[in-house]
């Protein structure tokens, strides 16, 4: 077993950003990961490039993951949110350097049309996408992300009414 996995609890979090992208109906953009055999859905997220602001990172990640960043940032989370990945996944992600992610979340209003969304990007992360309400998202999310999603949606709930 990899020494890093043995020391799982001592591994740091990967710092990143996450986005709750909503359309005019206040539905949430979700994508099904291309590398997942199961039917789990998630919101877009990603890392931060050295020197990049969180807001620039979130708009860059949006463009990279859904092929479009016709949007405005409505809110930034007050809190940082984190999740642990299961130990059996550590060796598959981030060269076994992290136990999970610590993220700043943004609520983003999508200003484009569905036709503007193109998940077939240079480095695709999603095999398919759809708009969901918050309950559908939580019920269909990866189990280790559900608590985080509930907390983020709770913080942004006023925008989702």
Swiss-Prot record:
Its EC number is 3.6.1.-. The keyword Hydrolase applies. The keyword Nucleotide-binding does not apply. GO terms for molecular function: bis(5'-adenosyl)-pentaphosphatase activity; guanosine-3',5'-bis(diphosphate) 3'-diphosphatase activity. CDD domains: NUDIX_Ap4A_hydrolase_plant_like. A motif (Nudix box) lies at residues 46-67. GO terms for biological process: nucleoside phosphate metabolic process; ribose phosphate metabolic process. Keywords: Hydrolase. Its cofactor is a divalent metal cation. Residues 12-154 form the Nudix hydrolase domain. It is an enzyme of class 3 (hydrolase). Belongs to the Nudix hydrolase family. RppH subfamily. Accelerates the degradation of transcripts by removing pyrophosphate from the 5'-end of triphosphorylated RNA, leading to a more labile monophosphorylated state that can stimulate subsequent ribonuclease cleavage. NCBIfam families: PRK00714.1-3, PRK00714.1-5. This is RNA pyrophosphohydrolase. It comes from Orientia tsutsugamushi (strain Boryong) (Rickettsia tsutsugamushi). The gene is rppH.
């Amino acid at each position: 077993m990899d020494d890093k996995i043995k020391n799982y609890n001592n591994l740091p979090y990967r710092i990143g950003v996450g986005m709750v992208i909503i359309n005019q109906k206040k539905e949430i953009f979700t994508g099904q990961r291309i590398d997942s055999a199961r039917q789990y859905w998630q919101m877009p997220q990603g890392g931060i490039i050295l020197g990049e602001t969180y807001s620039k990172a979130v708009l860059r990640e949006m463009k990279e993951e859904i092929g479009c960043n016709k949007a405005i940032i409505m809110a930034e989370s007050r809190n940082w949110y984190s999740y642990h990945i299961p130990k059996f996944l550590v060796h598959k992600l981030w060269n076994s350097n992290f136990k999970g992610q610590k993220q700043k979340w943004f609520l983003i209003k999508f200003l484009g049309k569905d036709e503007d969304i193109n998940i077939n990007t240079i480095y695709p992360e999603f095999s398919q996408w759809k708009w969901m309400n918050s309950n559908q998202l939580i019920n269909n999310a990866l189990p280790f992300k559900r608590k985080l999603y509930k907390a983020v949606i709770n913080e942004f709930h006023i925008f989702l009414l």
